[in-house]
Amino acid sequence: MRPSKRAADEMRAISFERGVSKHAEGSCLVKFGDTHVLCTASLEEKVPGWMRNTGKGWVTAEYGMLPRSTGERMRREAAAGKQGGRTQEIQRLIGRSLRAVVDMQALGEMQITVDCDVIQADGGTRTAAITGGWVALHECLRWMEARQMVRVEKVLKDHVAAISCGIYEGVPVLDLDYAEDSVAETDSNFVMTGKGGIVEIQGTAEGVPFSEEEFGALMKLARSGIDRLVSLQKMAVA
């Protein structure tokens, strides 16, 4: 029995609230159960130096956690003077995931930065950030389209979403919260497009290796979860 009493293939309650920032061109507050992430998409009409005069745009991401997003207060990384390795890994993952579904040529020489700030963490912050980040990116492109800068459907080729899966007490389960994630025998994150393409898979065994059969079960769970997330994204931006 899962601590949350959810079925093995049951996700937490998922919600997207658009337009939560009056300043950002695109924004979304995404909730995966008790994991809440504020995603904002900011437009700059310039690109990094190494992309100038290419005719192509760029999408990048940054990630952070508020000090009291966790059970005990975390020290701000800015106070330490540098970002931790985990933060750098996650924000690179978010950026890669979003770029996988963006046509940089259609975007033109502009950059969109998607900032993902964890307000409350209960497992799966990176998957929530990717999934909500897509909604914020869509809203930014919609803002640009209203000003005849781009066409959303030309720039954004597909949906992208992410979900965690793991083996908890010997059973493959979908969308782990912290109580499960902290003791799971296997923990994995799947990033996929709306058309079923795989962007990234991260999988780690804790103590006991997992079998190919178990990996297949996790993949099946992930696909069902991604399908549901994409449906919710479509409803959110409709």
From Swiss-Prot:
Keywords: Nucleotidyltransferase, RNA-binding, rRNA processing, Transferase, tRNA processing, tRNA-binding. The keyword RNA-binding applies. InterPro entries: ExoRNase_PH_dom1, ExoRNase_PH_dom2, ExoRNase_PH_dom2_sf, PNPase/RNase_PH_dom_sf, Ribosomal_Su5_D2-typ_SF, RNase_PH, RNase_PH_bac-type, RNase_PH_CS. SUPFAM superfamilies: Ribonuclease PH domain 2-like, Ribosomal protein S5 domain 2-like. It catalyses: tRNA(n+1) + phosphate = tRNA(n) + a ribonucleoside 5'-diphosphate. GO terms for biological process: rRNA catabolic process; rRNA processing; tRNA processing. It comes from the Bacteria. CDD domains: RNase_PH_bact. Phosphate binds at residues 86, 124-126. One of its GO terms (molecular function) is tRNA binding. Its EC number is 2.7.7.56. Belongs to the RNase PH family. Homohexameric ring arranged as a trimer of dimers. HAMAP family: RNase_PH (MF_00564). Phosphorolytic 3'-5' exoribonuclease that plays an important role in tRNA 3'-end maturation. Removes nucleotide residues following the 3'-CCA terminus of tRNAs; can also add nucleotides to the ends of RNA molecules by using nucleoside diphosphates as substrates, but this may not be physiologically important. Probably plays a role in initiation of 16S rRNA degradation (leading to ribosome degradation) during starvation. This is Ribonuclease PH. It comes from Brucella canis (strain ATCC 23365 / NCTC 10854 / RM-666). The gene is rph.
